[in-house]
Amino acid sequence: MRAVFGGQHGEREMQSEIAVKLSENVPRYTSYPTAPHFHSGVDAAIYRGWLEALESGDEISLYLHIPYCDKLCWFCACHTKQTHQYEPVAAYLRSLNAEIVTIAGLVSGKAHVRAIHFGGGSPTMLRPNDMVALGAALRDSFDLLPDATVSIEIGTNDMDKARLDALAQIGVTRASLGVQDFDPQVQKAINREQSFLQTKAVVDGVRSRGVESVNLDLLYGLPNQTRETICSTVAQALTLEPDRMALFGYAHVPWFKKHQTMIDEAWLPSPTERFAQSQLAARAIVAKGYEAIGLDHFAKPDDALAIAARAGVLHRNFQGYTEDRCPTLIGLGPSSIGRFRQGYVQNMASTAGYGRMVADGGLAAVRGVALSDDDRVRGWIIERLMCDFAFSAVDLVERFGKAGEKLLHRSRSIALHDPARALEFDGDSFVVRAESRPFVRTIAAKFDTYFKGGTARHSVAV
């Protein structure tokens, strides 16, 4: 997205034409192979072997999933459920602690934790004492590096002084707040009411307690959303001076998330309008000095994400773009996905089923994929396209040898026969043309041997 901010009328027309050609339903490529292609052949026994194969000195990241919210937002595509009672949450925490003990027993003394991320659902719906206890359990069970980062997704409507204090106690270094859109009509249409003043109070609250980095998530393509509302939201969000911002396109997938049927599709903007919203919002963010990162992130120039992007070491995982270089990510909680050198593994999605599996020292893995040599090469190409909009032919061959040479020929064929001329080869590198960068997911899909257009349902490319 970073190279499409010119204001020329002709350029906008060209981008709109490309949008019509390339706005297909394609994966988001937060992994490769993507989650729909995970299978039951990777189970708890294989997962245990991958954990035991970690070596002394390995650095790992942890992701903890809290699959509950006290109010369900209709736009949400996350694995979560609404509850007005706390007992299911308390019971779930007992299961989560059991999994923590089991995993720690397999990796402690070998692996060091570089990063922890709390996601959901809404992690901040936990009672403050439970939040502190969970943080303590992680520190007691795993070997955390002194400079380990701790990030959390915040539900603004959950927050009070006690919860803000709890974040400080567990050592949160980065807080991410979902804003979506500040317009009341948009908020009503997505069942999420959250004022600018509420958001500002939470941002001020976490900063006053030592949180080093604040991220704000915005959405375009929402029901009742217009170019005016998204621009107004961006302007208000920028006054909070976040260190990072994400600008995601709303993924309308009611066949996957039934509660999205609460959104009247007649209220959704057209593909052309979605594209216009995304570009206007992105231009406004960059105009304030933020650097565009990959497809949909922005960061201040001195932020670790921007530094990683400039150095060519940006990565992509299930939370989006990251500077985290750990080759191993351990997912804790139902539906959580782990990444290992050997492949990907995913826990049971059912909270009740997950609880039964982790009882008495069990693991909850029920699906995943072991990586082939071809998967590794294609995954590297796709990640570099998603992160850098380019990849080096020399790097490809040096890293992967004959397997890289095979994909080099495929890459040249894609560049040569692409009617949209979205990918070009300059003799050294394959580069996504500037005006095609918003549609890089469509380009990445050309390297995906699992993806068959029309056979799997994904969100639109823009």
Label the model's feature ranges.
Residues 1-61:
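Flexible, acidic/Gly-rich N-terminal and inter-domain linker regions that tether
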Residues 52-59, 83-106, 112-402, 461:
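C-terminal scaffold of the Radical SAM
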Residues 64-80:
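Local cysteine-cluster metal-coordination motifs and their immediate loop/turn environment
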Residues 403-416:
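Short amphipathic alpha-helical interaction segments
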Residues 418-428:
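A short, conserved structural fragment
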Residues 429-433:
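Minor-groove-contacting beta-hairpin "wing" of winged helix-turn-helix DNA-binding domains
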Residues 437-462:
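Short, amphipathic alpha-helical interaction segments positioned at domain boundaries
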